[in-house]
Amino acid sequence: MAAPKLGRARYRNNMRQAHSRVVTIMCALCFLAQGAAAAPQRVVSTFLCTDEYVFRLVPRERIAALSYEAVDRRPVVSTIADAARGIATIRPSTETVLARSPDLVVMYAGTNPRLHVNLKKLGVPILDVPWANSLADVRVITTMLGEKLGAPDKAQAMLAEMDREISRARASAPKPPVKGILFEPNGYASMGGITDEVMALSGVSNVAPPAMLTRTGTLPVEALIASAPELLILGGEARVGSARAYMVLHHPALAALKGRTLMEFAVLTPLLCPGPWSLNSAATFGDLARRARLAPSRASP
């Protein structure tokens, strides 16, 4: 009689294990179903830099609206200006946001404070996105947004592509790096942050003199010329008169750098908003750095 008793014991044990596996699987399925149900179904983005993320992470049918800047072409300030056509856009206000019946409003922290206060009073769910000051910040923010928007796999895919861009930039960057300055509309000289990181990865060492920057972050043309960089990247369009802010990029005094500095215009839209797509500018920086390194002698005439 011992054998049958042992058989029944094994049977009960096997059944317990099978039941445990079934319960585990069912719990996992329930969790996934809850996660899918919890993903926001009508997302409104109120700022250009949140548009960039929402468009990439949220299916079109779940995007209730992006900001008008996402598809603006006067000028183009978005990397998704063409791809996002057909999606509803708004000029963010309490009225325009509520008209889209959102179940989540994605805002950049600190932007449009009055709208933020009004939506909070009305109980509208808000996701505040912090500004990224480094590529490390980009990783944290992208992962967070992937979780909050129900798209963790998409977020990780974006970061994986960013890492591939970083590897490509490093592999082709000139060594030692080229001494360069990024001079932007109104005379702003980019210093620090993600732009500096992308430049460095691409083989450009930012030599804009911090001590010569004004309180507003602009660099006087005289200080720029005195720095005599190997590479001067003029951030924007080459055509004169496209906007008053671009006039300084055509300053006649910059002619003093001819023969010793490679000067080139470059549209760097991916750097306007920090995110994994910012690495798309690495190829532009790298190409300019290699050209500056291979250029003939730039000794002053």
Regions found by a protein language model. Name each.
Residues G35-P40:
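Boundary at the C-terminal end of the N-terminal hydrophobic targeting segment
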Residues Q41-V58, K154-V204, P296-P301:
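Basic- and aromatic-lined ligand-binding clefts that recognize polyanionic substrates
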Residues S67, P75, I194-T216, G236, ...:
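His/Asp/Glu-enriched short active-site or ligand-binding loop at hydrolase and phosphoryl-transfer sites
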Residues R85-E95, A132, M212-V221:
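Short helix-initiation/N-cap motifs at beta->coil->alpha
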Residues R42-G110, R114, V204-V207:
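A short, structured surface patch at a secondary-structure boundary
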Residues V23-A33:
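Bacterial N-terminal signal peptides
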Residues Q41-R42, D137-E147, Q156, G236-P301:
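Structured C-terminal subdomain patch of bacterial secreted/periplasmic proteins
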Residues N13-I25:
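Bacterial N-terminal signal peptides that target proteins for export
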